[in-house]
A protein has these predicted regions:
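Conserved AdoMet/S-adenosylmethionine-binding subsite of the radical SAM
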Residues: 8-173
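Glycine/small-residue-rich loop that forms an oxyanion/phosphate-binding "nest" at active or ligand-binding sites
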Residues: 1-2
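Short, charge-patterned binding micro-sites
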Residues: 5
Length: 173
């Protein structure tokens, strides 16, 4: 599983990893927001697509987990690559398999974005795994029942964020 940041920004490295995995019969999963399409000599076994919806927009004046203060330029860069439909469509078509893992913040607007994207990209409900929004254990515990209910009502799957439940706000674990 390759995750964190945007692994598909590193096309040469990803392609090299597909060679390594193919020679050994290893399945590669890449978790990506979909901002960059990468061709590889061997298709990636599973794309875990977690697009950035409007609820992911950084807030000016806050500090990122990496310690940077968010400014207008940071927000503009985020928005520039937030939803690259062309790259996402190519990624889902080119590689072997995928699932869609949107983060839901509990709002009607958030649900509308999740469903609009799913329909636009023609993603089946059984490939949709909704994750609760939140970056603390306490927030996730509040969100889990809401996400379970949403998934039951709409025919989606639910996936947790176990690393946050286990480690709360600790980084690099």
């Amino acid at each position: 599983m390759l995750t964190g940041g945007s692994p598909t920004m590193h096309a040469a490295l990803v392609n090299e990893l597909t060679h390594f995995a193919n020679e050994r019969g290893i399945l590669i999963t890449i978790e990506t927001e979909g901002s960059h399409f990468v061709t590889t000599d061997y298709p990636i076994g599973l794309i875990s697509l977690s697009p950035k919806f409007s609820n992911s927009r950084p807030v000016v004046g806050t500090t990122t987990p990496g310690g940077k203060v968010v400014d207008e330029r940071f927000v503009a860069q985020h928005e520039k690559f937030r939803l690259n439909y062309d790259a996402i469509e190519k990624t889902l078509t080119y590689h072997d398999d995928y699932h869609y893992k949107p983060v839901w913040d509990g709002t009607d607007e958030g649900l509308a974005e999740i469903e609009s994207f799913r329909v636009k990209m023609d993603i089946p409900k059984d490939k949709t795994f909704v994750m609760p929004a939140g970056d603390t254990r306490e927030t996730l515990i509040e969100m889990y029942p809401l996400v379970f209910e949403l998934c039951a009502e709409h025919g989606y799957n639910m996936t947790g964020r176990d690393h946050i439940i286990a480690y709360d706000t600790r980084r690099q674990v």
